[in-house]
Amino acid sequence: MHAKSLTELRAALAAKECSAVELAQHYLKRIDAARDLNAFVHVEPELTLAQAKAADAELARGAGGPLTGLPIAHKDVFVTRGWRSTAGSKMLANYESPFDATVVARLQAAGMVTLGKTNMDEFAMGSSNENSAFGAVKNPWDTNAVPGGSSGGSSAAVAARLAPAATGTDTGGSIRQPASFAGVTGIKPTYGRVSRYGMIAFASSLDQGGPMAQSASDCALLLNAMAGFDERDSTSLERDDEDFARHLGQPWAPGNDAGKPLAGLRIGLPNEYFGDGLADDVRAAIDAALKQYEALGATLVPVSLPKTELSIPVYYVIAPAEASSNLSRFDGVRFGHRAAQYGDLLDMYKKSRAEGFGPEVKRRILVGTYVLSHGYYDAYYLQAQKIRRIIANDFQEAFKSCDVIMGPASPTVAWDLGAKGDDPVQMYLADIYTLSVSLAGLPGMSVPCGFGAGANAKRPVGLQIIGNYFNEARMLQVADAFQRATDWHKQVPQVPAGV
């Protein structure tokens, strides 16, 4: 049952091959058996089964929609009423929200059943899911490897089939990179497509929620429920609702030959994505995927994104600056961790934050406070915002000669647990191909396209697909065509064994 996609599980529910309760029980059993992966931090079986019973009642009445009764896991950055919402931090270890995030509320309104909350890097700051106050997550393909971050719990849960789908958030690649490392499909929509209300903030001008699942068609199904204007989020974009699955299975252009469904599609290949630093085994998997696209009728076009190398310093000025402001609210007074022993009020602030935040969060708060301080704002933050605009303009120039842009989601496959913990800069460099997309506010996704080589033969590779603003439906069409011709997205690791 767990090998089925959301679409297949929906058909099974409709055919009464199983009930929503049976489905939930099946996944809860798998979650319990795979506790060593540490993908989940909060599971409440009674709440899950109550939601499943309600979904069965809806289905019995002939009501419900395409997602009714289907299970999903939520990244623990989305506040969820009745569940602890921790953002992977000791600061919020016992926090229970009085309301649901818009993403959670919309998926529950669509009838989905919450399986639990997934582990994550603290306050979404990290690329390996080793920065969590609740311990590191293991990659189900190779438990000596990281699952990526910051949505590593979600990527591991979907890869190990502990959940058929999960929510994630992407600030600088935190959906796409873990999707690549864990061999699942994940999409970061255009900034503003999905409401940030109830999503614990890291960097407000970059954070964006999105789905992670087995396939592009599953992601389209989820995005239909997740996306849409929300007046409670000032960054939410007011646009007409659309069906993100409307192009799936359709030719790129009317009249295309069945064997060449993507004839007319122009795929841009940035020179900067295929230079030094790209691992040979990742390059080989990406090249094979691009050959598959050529076989489907697409044309490969060279393009340039000349400011790609500046995306790392720009991101690590802007994101920490916004984080230092957003995280100032966690002071031990209103909610969150409070030190047990302290002197005056200022001492309470200091001790509560020192005890509540982990090393990476403290590092970024210090960097952010520095670049916003008097005398440095113009030199760092303002300059970074100017270069951010240039990066966005580079993409628009590239899209004049192509329909989508492709390349690796990460320069390497997943690295070993602990391999980069002593050098945060090396961790930051791993996001070189995803950061510029986030800075520009563009939609991007990662699609499984192979595995590494040699000692990395069990570690997946992800192909990144980048679209222009609001072009998610076409991106999903392009990804879906690849997945109809290949089976990388159907590969399942043997964890947990025997369940």
UniProtKB/Swiss-Prot annotation:
<protein>
    <recommendedName>
        <fullName>Glutamyl-tRNA(Gln) amidotransferase subunit A</fullName>
        <ecNumber>6.3.5.7</ecNumber>
    </recommendedName>
</protein>
<keyword id="KW-0648">Protein biosynthesis</keyword>
<dbReference type="InterPro" id="IPR004412">
    <property type="entry name" value="GatA"/>
</dbReference>
<comment type="similarity">
    <text>Belongs to the amidase family. GatA subfamily.</text>
</comment>
<dbReference type="Pfam" id="PF01425">
    <property type="entry name" value="Amidase"/>
</dbReference>
<comment type="subunit">
    <text>Heterotrimer of A, B and C subunits.</text>
</comment>
<dbReference type="InterPro" id="IPR036928">
    <property type="entry name" value="AS_sf"/>
</dbReference>
<dbReference type="GO" id="GO:0030956">
    <property type="term" value="C:glutamyl-tRNA(Gln) amidotransferase complex"/>
</dbReference>
<feature type="active site" description="Charge relay system">
    <location>
        <position position="75"/>
    </location>
</feature>
<feature type="active site" description="Acyl-ester intermediate">
    <location>
        <position position="174"/>
    </location>
</feature>
<keyword id="KW-0547">Nucleotide-binding</keyword>
<comment type="function">
    <text>Allows the formation of correctly charged Gln-tRNA(Gln) through the transamidation of misacylated Glu-tRNA(Gln) in organisms which lack glutaminyl-tRNA synthetase. The reaction takes place in the presence of glutamine and ATP through an activated gamma-phospho-Glu-tRNA(Gln).</text>
</comment>
<keyword id="KW-0436">Ligase</keyword>
<feature type="active site" description="Charge relay system">
    <location>
        <position position="150"/>
    </location>
</feature>
<dbReference type="InterPro" id="IPR023631">
    <property type="entry name" value="Amidase_dom"/>
</dbReference>
<keyword id="KW-0067">ATP-binding</keyword>
<dbReference type="GO" id="GO:0006412">
    <property type="term" value="P:translation"/>
</dbReference>
<dbReference type="InterPro" id="IPR020556">
    <property type="entry name" value="Amidase_CS"/>
</dbReference>
<dbReference type="InterPro" id="IPR000120">
    <property type="entry name" value="Amidase"/>
</dbReference>
<dbReference type="GO" id="GO:0050567">
    <property type="term" value="F:glutaminyl-tRNA synthase (glutamine-hydrolyzing) activity"/>
</dbReference>
<dbReference type="GO" id="GO:0005524">
    <property type="term" value="F:ATP binding"/>
</dbReference>
